[in-house]
Regions:
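Short linear motifs embedded in intrinsically disordered, charge-biased segments
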Residues: 322-456
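Active-site palm subdomain of RNA-directed nucleic acid polymerases
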Residues: 40-58, 159-192
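Catalytic palm active-site di-aspartate
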Residues: 5-8, 24, 58-60, 88-98, ...
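Catalytic palm subdomain of template-directed nucleic-acid polymerases
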Residues: 98-114, 189-213
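Short, conserved catalytic/metal-binding micro-motifs enriched in Asp/Glu and His
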Residues: 1, 24, 40, 94, ...
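Basic, alpha-helical interaction scaffolds
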Residues: 246-314
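Short, conserved micro-motifs composed of acidic
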Residues: 206, 221-253
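Conserved pre-catalytic core of RNA-dependent polymerases
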Residues: 1-152
């Protein structure tokens, strides 16, 4: 049988550029091949979802799941625990070359266990086992090399096969302790637990040991030096945890799916990081542009700067005035860079926003909160809304999960970090929306109706 031949382009990640391990291999497949993969991927997804085969909180590469849904769920669990006055430890796990180490036989065995068989299984076996690849860099090709393992990175089908491969991690980690929290975005995995004493810490350590055993059984490995633990709670006893004999490094803050999460759940660490980066990009734009007309500056700001300030914002939207102002300062600076309209410089910030027909970042985050709420309540986010929100009961329905007009109820809280968390801070704004907006038939309709409601 002729082997499938793949060309691989190395994409730099971080670290030293002269080390091959710091590059990610991306498959340069043809368009027909990608179309074929997309068709098969869609059918596999339908099969997995119709049979409820995806275990636990996997948010990667799935419709209705995202970095935002992952982070919102994570911070919901942690802030709720802290509001109850308990400590919480979370280990952020780093798999070593996760996609590259998936063994063919293990992946195919798990695909079969998920009900994939027959001609599709034969196709998958040919697609995975019978291939060779070479690196293409600056027009130069390396020699062909047989591929002995790995899910094809940069492919359409590879990610869903990887999800199938690690799908049973939750069962392994929660087998002896249902209180263990497991959250995944592809291979980015978090395991956590309330830890109020040595016995709780021992249970979390047992979970970590189970993860190490799972990795050994299935040909994967962890990177102990890149795993970190966050000790949440002012009275946290900060127990030590180990991967084999390697102590997991405790951190005050850690970057998770693009968001810096601190052990106090304070948003300032994240705001400081992203505003510093955004100001740096603005400086590059200033140096690179000669003609700073309105169209050019606004296009570059919206493309390269504003996304840095809004990624997964529902999970970290700040309530401290200093953080809010620090974010707004970036947009104020961007608008001052417009040089083709001298009248803008003389206007107040509010009038500049009206003239340019844009919102303040604070208002945009409110809109983002409401949009995310709409997605949760209407099934666009594939997460049970009752996991996050509380509702006013519908007195005319016998259904205990029925709610009247999606009317939300805020929790009684003791800490500001919980009071201003997404599910509580959005309550009043959501309840104040007209029914016509809340009952919009689609996401785009909701956006348009909301913008009309606030006069945009």
């Amino acid at each position: 049988m002729k082997k499938l031949e793949l060309k691989i382009s190395p994409i730099f990640k971080k670290g030293r550029k002269n080390k091959a391990v710091n590059y990610r291999p991306i498959n340069l497949a043809s368009v027909p091949a990608k179309i074929m993969e997309a068709i098969i991927k869609d059918e596999i997804l339908i099969h997995l979802r119709n049979n409820d085969l995806i275990i636990g909180l996997q948010h990667g590469f799935l419709p209705g799941r995202s970095c935002t849904t992952n982070l919102v769920d994570y911070m919901n669990v942690v802030t709720k625990a802290l509001d109850r006055g308990v400590s919480y430890d979370v280990v952020l796990v780093d798999f070593q070359k996760a996609f590259d180490k998936v063994p063919f036989d293990g992946m195919l065995a798990k695909a079969k266990a998920h009900g994939i068989d027959g001609e599709l299984m034969n196709w998958l076996r040919n697609w995975t086992e019978h291939r060779r690849q070479r690196v293409v860099l600056n027009g130069v090709d390396s020699e062909w090399t047989d591929v002995m393992s790995s899910v094809v990175q940069g492919s359409v089908l590879g990610p869903i096969l990887f999800l199938i491969y690690i799908n049973d991690i939750d069962d392994a980690l929660q087998a002896d302790d249902e209180e263990i929290y497991v959250s995944k975005f592809a291979d980015d995995t978090k395991v956590g637990r309330e830890v109020n004493g040595a016995s709780d810490a021992a249970k979390l350590q047992m979970c970590i040991d189970s993860l190490v055993r799972w990795c050994r059984d299935w040909g994967m490995s962890l990177h102990p030096d890149k795993c970190v633990v966050l000790h949440f709670g002012p009275k946290n006893l900060e127990f030590d945890y180990y991967i084999d004999n390697n102590k997991i490094k405790p951190e005050k803050a850690a970057r998770d799916l693009g968001v810096y999460v601190s052990d106090t759940c304070d948003t300032s660490a994240h705001v400081n990081k992203i505003t510093k980066k955004a100001h740096g990009v603005l400086s590059q734009i200033r140096r690179a542009t000669v003609v700073r007309d309105r169209r050019t500056i606004m296009m570059m700001y919206k493309s390269f700067v504003r996304p840095l300030l809004e990624t997964s914002a529902p999970a970290w939207n700040p309530y401290k005035r200093g953080d809010v102002d620090a974010l707004e300062k970036v947009q104020k600076r961007a608008l001052r860079m417009i040089g083709d309209d001298g009248s803008l410089c003389k206007m107040s910030y509010e009038n500049r926003l009206k003239t340019l027909k844009i919102q303040s970042l604070e208002c945009r985050r409110t809109r983002g909160d409401l949009l995310e709420t709409f997605k949760y309540l209407n099934g666009y986010n594939d997460v049970d809304p009752y996991r996050l929100f509380s509702f006013v009961r519908d007195r005319h329905s016998r259904d205990t999960r029925s709610h009247a007009n999606n009317h939300l109820v805020s929790e009684k809280t003791s800490l500001n970090l919980r009071k201003f968390f997404f599910t509580n801070r959005v309550t009043k704004d959501w309840n104040d929306l007209p029914p016509m907006v809340k009952e919009a038939p689609s996401v785009n309709s909701f956006k348009n109706l909301y913008d009309e409601h606030i006069g945009l």
